Regions:
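A short acidic Gly-Thr/Ser loop motif
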Residues: 38-45, 51-54, 63-67, 157-160
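A conserved active-site cap/scaffold subdomain adjacent to cofactor or substrate pockets
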Residues: 63-83
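Residue-level signature of catalytic and energy-coupling elements of molecular machines
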Residues: 5, 40, 73, 137, ...
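Feature representing long, continuous alpha-helical segments
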Residues: 71, 120, 124, 128-135, ...
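Residue-level detector of high-confidence beta-strand sites
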Residues: 59-61
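Glycine-rich phosphate-binding loops at beta-strand->alpha-helix junctions
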Residues: 95, 149-169
Length: 170
């Protein structure tokens, strides 16, 4: 990246890792001073960064993102990626108990036909992957020397829009 920027004759002042840049834009100074874990749930990956005493002190890339969840839905339900993304964003939730057990989601499939899945089934697919990611975050935090300094958690990124994610994280 640096070489491409130089080849374009653009002068760089500094290079900042994406999770640190997210933290600098999303967190207030008090959070960064007291100790905060920022979880940025992106499309391909999720990033965690811990700020303490105003500075980033720990970063980790998690190989699970919003696209992973969408692929899980597409594969499990044998539907297109695009339809899986629509189901995730419009009907999905992270907590199975928050889904309507009597509600079935109808959606079109190729050939003009339609299919349906239950709302709890969709929620279970989403929960399994989100739970895996959150366990990874928790294990990574516990293995680090920073577990005791984290006073709060901030979740950002596109994946943070999943319904009931904040409640699940508590």
């Amino acid at each position: 990246i640096i070489r491409c920027v130089k080849d374009a004759q653009i002068e760089t002042e500094t290079i900042i890792l994406e999770p640190i840049a997210s933290g600098l834009s999303c967190l207030n100074q008090t959070q960064k001073e007291e100790g905060v874990l920022l979880l940025d749930i992106g499309g391909g990956t999720s990033d965690m960064v811990i700020f303490y005493e105003g500075n980033p002190v720990f970063t980790k890339v998690i190989p699970i993102g919003g696209k992973t969840i969408t692929r899980d839905i597409a594969t499990t339900c044998n539907i297109s990626y695009e339809m899986a993304e629509t189901l995730k964003t419009q009907c999905g939730t992270c907590i199975v108990e928050k889904s309507n057990k009597d509600h079935h989601i109808n959606f079109p499939v190729s050939g003009g036909d339609s299919r349906q899945i239950s709302e709890p089934y969709l929620a279970e697919i989403i929960f399994c992957r989100i739970n895996q990611m959150l366990q990874f975050v928790q294990q990574t935090l516990q293995k680090s020397k920073y577990a005791n300094i984290v006073k709060s958690v901030v979740i950002t990124g596109g994946g943070a829009q999943l319904k009931h994610l904040e409640e699940l994280c508590r």
